[in-house]
Each structure stands twice: as structure tokens, then as C-alpha cells.
């Protein structure tokens, strides 16, 4: 049976790079949020600095996820899926803006629970160095990234978490490690959790 694996972490943790590498190694379909659909493109514009109420942005993310989940369920019939970000990003990023957790959970109620979540951690200063060459998005400020990092750990440690993955969470620290080192750690941890994932 095909598996749905999600990569999460603060900006600059190496998540997109590793998600793509793992997808390739597992012969999985790579996907991401926000998606490249119409709603996802609107979200990207807002993240680049367009004005928008925080609740509106939360609802847009949830609407984009409706489309994404539909595609994930279809694609899971054919292969494993690896997603760069998912509902956990909405929970921690939007809570960092003061949106109540219950509101975020309610609007994401339909979200499919993944089999496994890989959380990549990184020292905040190293994350900022990695992001220096990128265009800045509204969430890419050190105070916000610190809040988001704390939010991820709070989410992982909470009991009866609504979106608790079937095989739980894997946490990998990417600080001062090469791309290959991190990749090997992630792959070994995934195989340890789901031994039959590699055919």
C-alpha cells in the first residue's frame, strides 16, 4: 500500500531539497503547499507582501488544501506521495499570527492524515543565512521563525493530536550537516519506521 509522507519545518531548514530527494529515492510523486493551482498562486502573492486579513489567508490555505487532498488521494492509488508542507504548516504558522487553534482545525477538518511526518530542525541563525539569497516572505523574520519552531514542537508533544500521523514524527536536525548527510539520516529513519517502503 502506498504511503503519504509530509516534510515540515521552519523556512531555511532544507525541507524542499530533502523532500525532492526522498521522493526521487522512493519513486514517489512530489507535491507541495501552497499548490500551483489558482488558489495556491493567490496565496503566494499574499505571502510576497500583498495585503490580506490573517483569517482570509487561513481560509485560502484551507481551500487550496481541499484541491490538494483530492489530488493526493487520486495519486496514492499509483504511488507514494511526498509533500513539501501540509496542514501542520497551517496550524503553526497561523497560530503564530494569533488565529485560534480550534478555528484552524475546523476549516481543515477534511485534511487526510499522513502516514509519516518528517520535521527538519535547524539553528535559527543558520536558517536565516540560508534564506539570505531568497525573496523575503511575510513569515521570514527571526522572531516569527522562533515562534513557529516552538509551535512544531508543541504540536508533536501534544496528546490526542488531531492530525497525528500513523507512524508518528521523525525529527532530524540539519544544522551544520551536508545535504547528503541529512538525506541518509532521513532515509534510514523512514525505513526504520516503514521497512517495506522501498520495494
Swiss-Prot record:
GO biological process, one term: dTDP biosynthetic process
EC number: 2.7.4.9
UniProt keyword annotation of Plastid present: no
Top enzyme class: transferase
GO MF term set: ATP binding; dTMP kinase activity
Domain of life: Archaea
Amino-acid positions noted as binding ATP in the UniProt annotation, renumbered to this chain: 9-16
Reaction catalysed by this enzyme: dTMP + ATP = dTDP + ADP
Statement: the UniProt record of this protein carries the keyword Kinase: yes
Example of a GO cellular component annotation carried by this entry: cytoplasm
Signal peptide: none
Cited PROSITE patterns: THYMIDYLATE_KINASE
Annotated keywords: ATP-binding, Kinase, Nucleotide biosynthesis, Nucleotide-binding, Transferase
Entry-linked NCBIfam families: DTMP_kinase
Protein family (similarity comment): Belongs to the thymidylate kinase family.
Protein name: Probable thymidylate kinase
Native source organism of the sequence: Methanococcus maripaludis (strain C6 / ATCC BAA-1332)
Lineage: Archaea, Methanobacteriati, Methanobacteriota, Methanomada group, Methanococci
GN (gene name): tmk
